[in-house]
């Protein structure tokens, strides 16, 4: 039997499976006037395609903020799941649209939906939007959310070499030595051969001796005499200073939102800058 739209689909209801509707098309393309006309004529804003994509998913993935606003105002389900489990907030983060992310959050989108795959924070790290990453953390995103494919958001940001996102995560208290199959963010940094990333992770307490499920240290993924290899060699011969180790341990003690706590300490501004990695 051919999938068909539900008879009498009301705004706020999820319809039967259909192919992409005019509402999907208008939402994806950012045709806000056409979308508004469709909504006013009674078109269902929660109709799902065979892969469970709603018009709100389509608009969010393309960063069409005006269309997202129209759909939400018309009763679109803010936490609808597609076939992969992703919500519109995941898609908005994947697009890197801070405006869409703000709209969805204002309508109550869950920042930590129960997922085994990429969370909104993972998607923001994947897209490289440090602004989205910062906003999600501010509203309570789980820094250690685990994706069965990628690991933590920090793993994703390092694998994609998004240094701004990495620093936001680390400053917010992300576990620098979190592991997926014993593989840490430092292993990813070594694999992508990014010296700046390697140095940042080590400065935040990354364990250069951690071994993955193949028994390899991060340095084992570098070429002899290459810049990354020399970087690891330097830190093996020159461990972090006492002041650096104190900073790492104090940051661990402050935990999530550590920067906010450090800024309120009754200590000289120079020390606050040092503890904040400025």
UniProtKB/Swiss-Prot annotation:
Question: Could you tell me which Gene3D superfamilies the record lists for this protein?
Answer: Ankyrin repeat-containing domain (1.25.40.20), SOCS box (1.10.750.20)
Name one process (GO BP) from the record: intracellular signal transduction
Instruction: Answer whether the UniProt record assigns the keyword Transcription to this protein.
Output: no
Q: Where is the SOCS box domain?
A: 229-278
Pathway annotation:
Protein modification; protein ubiquitination
Output a single Gene Ontology CC term carried by this record: cytosol
Primary role: May be a substrate-recognition component of a SCF-like ECS (Elongin-Cullin-SOCS-box protein) E3 ubiquitin-protein ligase complex which mediates the ubiquitination and subsequent proteasomal degradation of target proteins.
**Its family?**
Belongs to the ankyrin SOCS box (ASB) family.
Record-given protein name: Ankyrin repeat and SOCS box protein 13
Question: Per the UniProt entry, what species is this protein from, by scientific name?
Answer: Homo sapiens
List the gene name: ASB13
């Amino acid at each position: 039997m051919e999938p068909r739209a539900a008879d009498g689909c009301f705004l706020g209801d999820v319809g039967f499976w259909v192919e992409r509707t005019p509402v999907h098309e208008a939402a994806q393309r950012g045709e806000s006037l056409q979308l508004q006309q469709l909504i006013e004529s009674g078109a269902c804003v929660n109709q799902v395609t065979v892969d469970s994509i709603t018009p709100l998913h389509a608009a969010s993935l393309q960063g069409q903020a005006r269309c997202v606003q129209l759909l939400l105002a018309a009763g679109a389900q803010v936490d609808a799941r597609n076939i992969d489990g992703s919500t519109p907030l995941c898609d908005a983060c994947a697009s890197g649209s801070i405006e869409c992310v703000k709209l969805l959050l204002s309508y109550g989108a869950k920042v930590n939906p129960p997922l085994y795959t990429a969370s909104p924070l993972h998607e923001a790290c994947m897209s490289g939007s440090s602004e989205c990453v910062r906003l999600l953390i501010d509203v309570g995103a789980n820094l250690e959310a685990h994706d069965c494919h990628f690991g933590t958001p920090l793993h994703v940001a390092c694998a994609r070499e998004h240094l701004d996102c990495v620093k936001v995560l680390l400053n917010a208290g992300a576990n620098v030595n979190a592991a997926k199959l014993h593989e840490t963010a430092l292993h990813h940094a070594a694999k992508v051969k990014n010296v700046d990333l390697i140095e940042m992770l080590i400065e935040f307490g990354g364990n250069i001796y951690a071994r993955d499920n193949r028994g390899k240290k991060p340095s084992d993924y570098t070429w002899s005499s290459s810049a990354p290899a020399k970087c690891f060699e330097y830190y093996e011969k020159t461990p972090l200073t006492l002041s650096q180790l104190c900073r790492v341990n104090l940051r661990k003690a402050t935990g999530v939102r550590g920067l906010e706590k450090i800024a309120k300490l009754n200590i000289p501004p120079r020390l606050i800058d040092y503890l904040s990695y400025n």
